[in-house]
From Swiss-Prot:
Protein's UniProt name: DNA topoisomerase 1
Composition bias, Low complexity: 1141-1151, 1183-1199
SUPFAM superfamilies (alphabetical): Prokaryotic type I DNA topoisomerase (SSF56712), Zinc beta-ribbon (SSF57783)
Subunit note: Monomer.
Native source organism of the sequence: Zymomonas mobilis subsp. mobilis (strain ATCC 31821 / ZM4 / CP4)
């Protein structure tokens, strides 16, 4: 039996299928050991010897390999064919050697693609380990350790908020910071262009002025509006004819197949993938045997692969799309190693594979590789110059025509944007056939103003390209370097562009000031050259390390001796031109804008650097590092914005794929009736036939929190009013929304007949009448609701029984009027004041609403001629409702009857009442608007437990802590809204059909799907992760047997070296109150500004040392608290007195809670629990019988209460 060892289980499964029964294939699951994070792991004084430590979570993997080796005849190391793969094989070999398990026959095989042919060929041609590659790995690992382990402790002690520094990551961060400084220092320059729209042979085109008054125009030649208008005038008045036509053929060649770098760039541009996501997908495709090895600098393809590609092109297209000779490519990137093929599909006949993001990436790789062997595209580029009669002014137009598409039929490479590239979109226009002497029609001439733009911020694609161009890092490390910058919160992503955070800018400034050489682009690229020389056997790895360490060590010792205050002062001077720029107005840029006497300076704080006034604490003016002149006071809440009014009850919001805020429970315009114009008469809401009248978003006439009636009637707000007050009906949140009044018992009016007095609406009021069928009043027309798409303008509505009443609204569309009627002819008198029921209960009654705009007045007549109905202006764009009730008991009419002896008295009373009502309505509306704004306000605050975000005010406010990896000063409304929306639903799992939830807990961000959890690396990943990445994360967690809850907390997150105090391993654990470190005897919680991922061994030792020095007083306090508790339980006679004193105890608990709600992200819960316990026990001792019958659980509760009550309280 032969044992084959590879890195991953997927690769092992594929290879085992090809090799057959004579082989056993096991996976090491990546690296098996590394340098421990402790002093002495690399010893420069002993030839840079290294001490390795096995990963604790790989113990069972190693055990499986060791057991299998014992039963095998030979060992075949088949890890990846690069520096890291060679290192993994070397580590396995060294480990087996130390345990004396190494078999006699050890071979190394490599293959660029996991296909049957490649694997069997590799097995037939084994080799030995490549010592040059191993030495290059050792040199790189030692360099990273020496830089990181030496610089990071300096940062922790001298630079608040800094987490780590690295040989490559710090240089990549400098690129981002330098670009940001370019943007900030950029001064836009105005320039103008003059263009003319022309036409010939019915084909339009645009020409640009390139020569004016005999001078050739450059981009910035026309600098102001005056010049532009003069040039525009000359073009308008000139007669232009074609003076020159130049046509030349152009060929475009395809790009070579992907390297690691170009794959990351193109996947970011075309697919929007992060570099790390691209590499995870490519790794999976490689292990499944679908593509070749994905970590490569090479652009060449194997001859057999080229032949397969040319065959596929011929089959899919025709012979004209295949070049005469196969295309050969050579890499142009700096520090490239062409040991491996380019990234290509293993089978060109397969144009689709896998699913989701895997399929999208595979298709991109397949198209690029196939197009690289296709024929060139043939184009014809034409340039036409048009000159006016003076010969001084020249217009130019450029166009091109594709004669043969060639490879463009299949693939065209994307390009990064260029802010100042105005010609990028030119040159592709279709031009008419123009000859010398032709005079195209001049249609319009325009002068356009422009401003030069700063260079764009780096995207992942452009940052990778820049790193590749400068020779910084290796293509295989680009993704991990960028991910570290994001995980450390040194950069943030905004619209897929990198912006340096305050911590990132401060770290870069520190390194530039004190370690400028080691973060220079040339020095870093030079180190990469040295590593390549080691890989090729042309340099000694120990000499390279010695040359580096000889200068680096003294520099770090020099900086370590300086005090933090001196470091901050140096940075203050170094950053002065940026932090306090001189505006040239004679004003001191360091003068405090708040007190005007203090001077601003750079200070260090818990969350990093900031600008503060020298008069602190008298003046509390501060501003963020790089924030500008608008400072803040951290003691005051900072308003970030307002939530939309139609967010759901909890303030949770939904987000689009681009991160835009979407109301969680909004329906479409067709569903709600809300149009762009603002108002529709009706809105249908979810429920069993429920409908509600919908007006403006700023003043809903119904309570969205109240459930609608399940019988199909609108849920209404019933208000009972007395005297001459107006009774509310319909869909109203208060009595001012829809007011209806009726006067009854007017004898003078009844003798002469019905007098319908309608208080007219403000705009275009029509008239509506309602009559019975008893002949007492004629029916007039009514603009009825358009039901089922009906557009009838007039409708006569009658009541067969002669009894009209009000009910619930209909749900017809665009209804201006809705009539409320009863089938049984009875009036629901529940809302009628008691003193008027006798005069109105036996009468037929109806009322109508008259809105302010585009609605109708309504008058009502009845057979008894005793009721005078008034239509009162409602102030809303809602008409009258047409709905029938099934029974009188379901009717929701509100009728207020006002007895009077004269019509004039009624009119005066109504006018006075309307004035008062209008004023009170305005006050109430203003109050409601103010309360609504407070409830929707999103603020950033700082409380006892740190910074947090709050939505609303008071005890009902929603709060969420600012995550540890987010700088509180950088939280804007968009980020705050997304944090408040957590946890969020990502989508249904394609296998289980269960919802995947992304949230954050005591252990940080996580994914949850049907009780299965997966960790997320950062808040950014929590907010941005999509369904495909979430499924991959959950699968990886299941594969790694990740556990959650109590089980997870029992296993260490990270194991450091042995403690110098206890000589036991120092471990990072998950505890009940969050992550902590332990050395077996002392436990120390992590500070809030330290993430578990960034914690190093030195930090852990410092935390444990500080915790061990702290006095232990908690146990003494607990013992003292138990003594009065015992006395109180035995003193039964004092129980009645407790009832009087305990009324004050809940008050203190309430006060604590209120303080927590207003000032802290996490309300204090323990005082509330004590208050409940005291109230319970205070009542029970009052009755002796109750005390005797009390079970043991109540006695325990009484004991707990007595413990919480001081002795002097009982005495009172």
């Amino acid at each position: 039996m032969k044992l084959v060892v590879v890195e991953s289980p997927a690769k092992a499964k594929t290879i085992e299928k090809y090799l057959g029964s004579g082989y056993q294939v096991l996976a090491s699951y990546g690296h098996i050991r590394d340098l421990p994070s402790k002093d002495g792991s690399v010893n420069p004084d002993n030839g840079f010897s290294m001490v390795w430590q096995n990963y604790p979570d790989k113990a069972h993997r190693l055990k499986a390999i060791e057991d299998a080796v014992k039963e095998s005849d030979s060992l075949i190391l088949a890890t990846d064919p690069d520096r890291e793969g060679e290192a993994i094989s070397w580590h396995i070999l060294e480990l087996l050697k130390t345990k004396k398990l190494l078999p006699d026959d050890v071979e190394r095989v490599t293959f660029n693609a996991i296909t049957k042919a490649a694997v069997t060929d590799a097995m037939a041609h084994p080799r030995q380990l490549d010592n040059d590659l191993i030495n290059a790995y050792l040199a790189r690992r030692a360099l990273d350790y020496l830089v990181g382990f030496t610089l990071s402790p300096i940062l922790w002690r001298k630079l608040p908020g800094a987490k780590s520094a690295g040989r490559v990551q710090s240089v990549a961060l400098r690129l981002v910071v330098d670009r940001e400084q370019e943007i900030e220092g950029f001064k836009p320059q105005e320039y103008w262009s003059v263009e003319a729209d022309m036409e010939a042979d019915s084909i339009g085109f645009t020409s640009r002025l390139i020569q004016w008054r005999g001078q050739k125009l450059e981009k910035l030649s026309i600098a102001d509006k005056t010049q532009a208008e003069a040039a525009q005038s000359d073009v308008e008045s000139g007669h232009f004819t074609v003076s020159n036509v130049e046509t030349k053929p152009v060929s475009r060649n395809p790009q070579p197949p992907f390297t690691t770098s170009t794959l990351q760039q193109e996947a970011a541009r075309k697919l929007g993938f992060a570099a790390s996501h691209t590499m995870r997908l490519a790794q999976s495709l490689y292990e499944e045997g679908l593509i070749t090895y994905m970590r490569t600098d090479g652009v060449q393809m194997d001859e057999s692969a080229i032949a397969a590609a040319r065959k596929t092109i011929t089959q899919r297209y025709d012979g004209g799309y295949v070049p005469d000779k196969p295309r050969q490519y050579q890499v142009k990137a700096k520090n490239a190693q062409e040991a491996h093929e380019a990234i290509r599909p293993t089978d060109f006949s397969r144009d689709k594979a896998a699913s989701g993001d895997h399929a999208r990436l595979y298709e991109l790789i397949w198209k690029r590789a196939l197009a690289s062997q296709m024929a060139s595209a043939k184009l014809e580029r034409t340039t036409v110059d048009l000159t006016d009669g003076t010969g001084q002014n020249v217009l130019r137009v450029t166009g091109q025509v594709v004669l043969f598409s060639g490879f463009l039929t299949l693939y065209e490479e994307s390009a990064d944007d260029n802010a100042n590239d105005r010609d990028g979109k030119e040159g592709r226009a279709r031009l008419p056939l123009l000859r010398a002497g032709d005079a195209p029609l001049k249609k319009e001439v325009r002068a356009d103003q422009h401003f030069t733009q700063p260079p764009p911020r780096y995207s992942e694609a452009s940052l990778v390209k820049k790193m590749e161009d400068l020779g910084i890092g290796r293509p295989s490390t680009y993704a991990s370097v960028i991910q570290v910058l994001k995980d450390r919160a040194y950069v943030t992503l905004e619209r897929n562009r990198f912006i340096p955070s305050e911590a990132g800018r401060l770290l870069t400034a520190f390194l530039e000031r004190f370690f400028e050489r080691y973060v220079s682009y040339d020095f870093t690229a030079g180190l990469e050259d040295s590593l390549d020389e080691i890989s090729g056997g042309r340099a000694d790895w120990q000499k390279v390390l010695d040359a580096f360490w000889h200068d680096f060590k003294p520099k770090t010792a020099e900086v370590m001796e300086q005090q933090p205050s001196a470091i901050t002062a140096e940075l203050d001077k170094f950053l002065e031109p940026w932090l306090f720029p001189d505006k040239g107005d004679g004003h001191d840029p360091r003068e405090c804008p708040s007190c005007h006497t203090g001077r601003l300076a750079l200070k260090g704080g818990r969350f990093g650097a900031f600008i503060a006034c020298s008069n602190y604490p008298e003046c509390k003016y501060t501003r963020g590092f790089g924030q500008g002149e608008d400072g803040v006071d951290d003691n005051e809440p900072v308003l970030l914005g307002y939530m939309p009014e139609n967010s759901d009850d909890d303030g949770y919001m939904a987000f689009s794929d681009q991160g835009d805020i979407l109301p969680a429970n909004t329906a479409s315009a067709s569903e709600t009736g809300v149009t762009d114009g603002g108002i529709a008469a009706n809105a249908a809401f979810s429920g069993k036939g429920n409908s509600a009248s919908h007006t403006d978003r700023d003043d809903l006439p119904f309570d969205p929190d109240e459930p609608a009636s399940s019988t199909g009637n609108v849920a209404s707000s019933q208000s009972r009013m007395t005297g001459d007050e107006t009774a509310s009906s319909g869909n109203s949140r208060d009595s001012s929304a829809h007011g209806v009044s009726t006067t009854a018992g007017i004898d003078a009016e009844s003798q002469a007949g019905i007098s319908n007095q309608a208080l007219a609406g403000k705009n275009n009021a029509g008239r509506t009448a309602v009559s019975d069928n008893k002949g007492n009043n004629s029916s007039s027309t009514i603009a009825a609701a358009r039901k089922g798409g009906s557009t009838d303008d007039n409708a006569t509505v009658s009541d067969p029984d002669g009894d009209i009443g009000s009910g619930a609204s209909s749900s017809g569309q665009d209804a201006d009027n809705r009539l409320l009627s009863h089938r049984n002819g009875d009036i629901d008198s529940r809302a009628i004041p008691a003193d008027h029921k006798d005069s109105s209960s036996d009468q037929n009654a109806s009322h109508a609403l008259s809105p302010d705009r585009n609605s109708d007045d309504a008058s009502v007549s009845n057979s008894d001629k005793k009721i005078d109905s008034k239509a009162v202006s409602t102030g809303h764009d809602v008409g009258n409702a047409i709905t029938s009730d099934n029974s009188p008991s379901d009717n929701v009419a509100h009728l207020a009857s006002t007895p009077s002896s004269a019509t004039s008295s009624v009119k005066v009373a109504l006018e006075t009442e309307n004035n008062d009502t209008a004023a009170s309505k305005a006050d109430e509306q203003a109050k409601e608007e103010e309360e609504s704004r407070k409830a929707r306000a999103v603020t950033r605050r700082t409380g006892r437990f740190g910074p947090y975000i709050q939505l609303g005010e008071g005890k009902n406010a929603k709060r969420v802590s600012v995550p540890r990896d987010v700088n509180p000063r950088e939280v804007d409304f968009s980020l705050a809204s997304r944090l408040l929306a957590l946890p969020r639903e990502i989508g249904l799992h394609p296998e289980s059909g269960k919802m995947i939830i992304a949230g954050t807990g005591r252990y940080g961000p996580y994914l949850n799907c049907d009780g299965k959890y997966a960790r997320l690396s950062s808040t950014e990943e929590l907010l941005d992760i999509d369904i495909d990445r979430a499924v991959v994360k959950l699968a990886e967690a299941a594969q790694n047997k990740g556990r959650t809850g109590a089980t997870l907390s029992r296993e260490p997150l990270k194991v450091f070296g042995d403690s110098p105090v206890t000589e036991k391993p120092v471990q990072l654990m998950n505890g009940r109150y969050g992550p902590y470190v332990t050395d077996g005897e002392t436990n120390a919680s992590l500070p809030k500004d330290t993430t578990p991922e960034s914690l190093t061994f030195e930090e852990a030792l410092a935390l444990l040392e500080a915790r061990a020095k702290m006095p232990k007083k908690k146990k003494t306090k607990k013992a003292a608290a138990k003594k009065p508790a015992a006395k109180k339980t035995t003193t039964k006679k004092a129980a009645p007195k407790k009832a009087t004193t305990k009324t004050a105890t809940p008050k203190s608990a309430t006060t604590d809670n209120a303080t927590s709600e207003d000032g802290d992200a996490t309300p204090a819960k323990s005082p509330a629990k004590k208050a409940v316990a005291k109230k319970t026990t205070a009542k029970k001792p009052a009755s002796k019988s109750a005390t005797k019958k009390a079970p043991s659980s109540k006695t325990t509760a009484a004991k707990k209460t007595s413990k919480a009550t001081p002795k002097d309280e009982v005495a009172e």
